[in-house]
């Protein structure tokens, strides 16, 4: 929790305060927040999360990102544009790479049995959104970012399997209560060893969330955002990159 607060809020605040103190306020300050600041909402009707909704983060990561947003939005004289991307994937990304490695070994784990709607954003499309905001001189605005599609929980793993050329994969749906116990034990063990566990209480809450839809229409209508990487195209690129760089 402290590390998230330090990395996402304290360092952001210190950097911005230094810019203001030195009279080096930029024309625009782009802050990459997260869809996670809204927490698990609309899980009954699976409606897209929009700017009309109230942010209610349930993770230390989400809380730290929201804290940074509130700080930046309180500075009326500081030109900020905020992006709230959904799951970002691309070359060098390691969290999703763990899933790729697992599927290469013919195992795919999915959290829970209830419907889960997922959204993704390839890093190049996120960069496109950032440059559009810079070109349009956007200030004091926040946008959700995804590739505009909604995917079933199996779609990502099926695409990875296809690009890896795996003839078969065992798909295992893990009950949430088991996943929670494993996450807590992994976090405790890592803490005892002075390490950071990829699987932890925060990660469990993220995997547990069922609705990751978000409304990108303001980004499309105001800035002309046109995502170029649907999931199949993005997965093809990252698998090719992992192979080229010797990760696989």
Name each model feature, range by range.
Residues 13-60, 81:
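Conserved Rossmann-fold NAD(P)-dependent oxidoreductase catalytic core, especially the SDR/UDP-sugar
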Residues 63, 67, 93-98, 112-134, ...:
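Substrate-positioning beta->alpha
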């Amino acid at each position: 929790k402290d590390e998230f607060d330090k990395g996402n809020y304290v360092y952001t605040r210190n950097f911005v305060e230094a810019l203001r103190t030195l009279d080096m306020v930029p024309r625009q300050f782009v802050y990459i927040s997260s869809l996670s600041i809204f927490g698990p909402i609309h899980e009954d009707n699976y409606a897209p999360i929009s700017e009309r909704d109230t942010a209610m983060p349930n993770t230390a990561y989400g809380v730290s990102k929201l804290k940074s947003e509130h700080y930046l939005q309180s500075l009326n004289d500081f030109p900020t544009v905020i992006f709230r991307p959904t799951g970002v994937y691309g070359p060098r990304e390691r969290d999703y790479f763990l899933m790729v490695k697992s599927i290469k070994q013919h195992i795919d784990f999915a959290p829970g049995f209830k419907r889960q709607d997922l959204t993704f954003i390839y890093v190049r499309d996120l960069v496109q959104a950032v440059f559009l905001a810079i070109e349009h001189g956007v200030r004091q605005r926040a946008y959700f970012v995804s590739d505009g599609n909604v995917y079933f929980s199996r779609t990502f793993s099926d695409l990875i399997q296809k690009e890896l050329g795996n003839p078969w994969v065992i798909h295992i749906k893990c009950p949430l209560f088991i996943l929670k116990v494993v996450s807590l034990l992994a976090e405790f063990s890592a803490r005892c060893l002075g390490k950071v566990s990829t699987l932890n209480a925060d990660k469990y809450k993220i995997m547990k969330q069922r609705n990751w839809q978000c409304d990108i229409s303001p980004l499309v209508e105001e800035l002309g955002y046109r995502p170029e990487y649907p999931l199949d195209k993005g997965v093809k690129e990252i698998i090719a990159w992992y192979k080229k760089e010797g990760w696989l």
